[in-house]
């Protein structure tokens, strides 16, 4: 996805919106100022996605997955709404949404039979924020389908 592959990006976006629909999450997507973040309303089970985030950034799919994560985390809503300005930056709630989004995109990747064996390649291919690299390594290790030489770990 980091490569300019709009068809693949659009397929992932479609998957994520279908996932939201299947989980009773309403969504609004809009184009606004590139600096206006996406947000979620937990009580209403609704996400609002700025499709012009950083001028149509390849990270838009991760933004969608992240906002879905806010709704799906099952925790009591302590805020009126969740507004994400910087992935992995604010608090545990933002971090949990990042992790949910990472796992959701990984689930999609597996369904596509992408067969990533390197977490860094997965992150890059799906334009996931590099702040998620440590969590991606942990996720790959937990999944037991680890095959990367960088740290001398090889699992099959």
Set out the residue ranges of the language-model regions.
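Active-site hotspot residues in diverse enzymes, especially metal/ion-binding acidic/histidine motifs
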Residues: 1-156
